[in-house]
């Protein structure tokens, strides 16, 4: 059985889905893209966004604000959004920039 160090910290199925969507779109993804994926695949948006935050925290992906500046995300940021146990649309409004694989 793999150790905790070897286990991904995020949902690998969601990460794969998002990566494929990024490849098809060939440009950074936005909340609008994630909302569309959630509808198309009958998933919760907060599950997708939790995965995106974890990918960014572990530098697999990066988040850029609406001005295009790379914004590092950390576990504290994610924990602060989870006060109500789920990420809501209101929580995510501040993240109106774009997401792309880390380079």
Segments the model singles out, each with a brief description of its role:
Residues 1-103:
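Long, charge-rich, low-complexity intrinsically disordered regions
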